[in-house]
Amino acid sequence: PASPSSRLYTYDGLYDVVNVHFDNGAAGFGVYQFTLIRRPGQPQLGLSIVQFVGNLKKKGLARPNLLLEDISQGQENWPVCVVNEVDGDPAPTNFTYIPNIKYPKWFSHVLPQGCDCEGGCSDETNCSCVSKNGGELPYNEKGYIIRDKKVVYECGSSCRCSSNCSNRVSQKGLRYQLEVFKTKNRGWGVRSVNPIQPGGFICEYTGELLSDAEAEQRVENDEYLFELGNNCNLESTDGGLQLKNMSTTMISSMNEDIGYTIDAKCMGNVARFINHSCSPNLFAQNVLYDSDDLRFPHVMLFAMENIPPMRELTYDYNYTVGQVLDASGNIKSKACYCGASDCKGRLY
């Protein structure tokens, strides 16, 4: 869970003690004081990154190596800039930015039955949305998801509660200032200028909604295809956000002849640039607010741990090795370069 003090603590590397001495501290008591030297070859100091970000905001400094001020073209709550500090590649603009899912002509939402709450919903009220969520609100008072669920039911347009209801979180768009940046060996990635606490909402995975039959005709786009109900976190846990070893299982009601997929190859948002990791810091969560149809959940990405500024955001693509095929039915293979200590070596 998030820290009650709202302070963000981050791991900052390994240090060797090179000297120790006993002296009087500021309060007049004797204390041991240590001289530390940081071991070489580790990532940049978290403190220096925080100071860099603070200077950008405080002094209004221009973002170094900026390629594009806002790839969303004003469609998000924050500008999503593009930065390349690695090579001479231009900004990736070969797609149409859409902040919401692009539905096909045949699709129509069946509005859910909304709650009758006035003002905001709470666990203590006789709220139908609270009942859908197992008798508790999925978010705390600061808008952080409390625990992973099979499905989170947010209040929507059918509900009488206000737009400021604490059960309306992911539908409001970006909460953090994200930027697209060029990685050294994995193409483009995404990071946040702001610190993120566990349970913080990052973004929705948007794109074109396709039937699985249509998606199979776009096998060349496999790294942009997100199968609804298959990659999301569908098994709830009892330990809150202890999600590092989270398993994924299909909801039985989704096991139908017709499945659906989101394709972000030609249309998508900042989520299309978020890379895979075998040890991710984000997880995918099914969310419903404009329908109760489990076949068409919104795929929302949330933080599963404290994430300091400028650290790459990642989630587990959840591919099964040997199950990704090309147009001819041959098994495809791709190496994984996530760099995690428990990296599986192959993305698929």
For the regions a protein language model found, what residue spans apply to each?
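Short coil-to-beta-strand transition motifs
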Residues: 4-16
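Short solvent-exposed strand/turn elements
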Residues: 21-46
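Catalytic cores of histone-lysine modification enzymes
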Residues: 168-291, 295, 305
